[in-house]
């Protein structure tokens, strides 16, 4: 029965990891860069890198 709880927790962890860009590695994997200010000119925000203040920006 403990194995079921472990597998369920692992499933939730995997599903929550794919719910958006939340780190610099996943930002780079999606073709973006981490910028601590507003995304400049031709770039648009596709997520965050280190929480709310740092944006993950990508060119159109």
From Swiss-Prot:
Tell me which Gene Ontology terms the entry assigns under biological process: cell chemotaxis; defense response to bacterium
Keyword Secreted recorded = yes
**What GO MF annotations does this protein's record show?**
CCR6 chemokine receptor binding; chemoattractant activity
Signal sequence span is 1-22
The molecule here is called Beta-defensin 11
Q: Which gene encodes it?
A: DEFB11
Pfam families listed in its UniProt record: Defensin_beta
Q: Which family does it belong to?
A: Belongs to the beta-defensin family.
**Stretches assigned to coiled coil:** none
An annotated GO cellular component of this protein is: extracellular space
Going by the entry's taxonomy, the superkingdom of the source organism is recorded as Eukaryota
Intracellular or extracellular location(s): Secreted
Q: Which organism is it from?
A: Bos taurus
Cysteines engaged in disulfide bonds, as pairs: 27-56, 34-49, 39-57
**Keywords of this entry:** Antibiotic, Antimicrobial, Defensin, Disulfide bond, Secreted, Signal
Tissue and organ distribution: Neutrophilic granules.
Question: What task does this protein carry out?
Answer: Has bactericidal activity. Active against E.coli ML35 and S.aureus 502A.
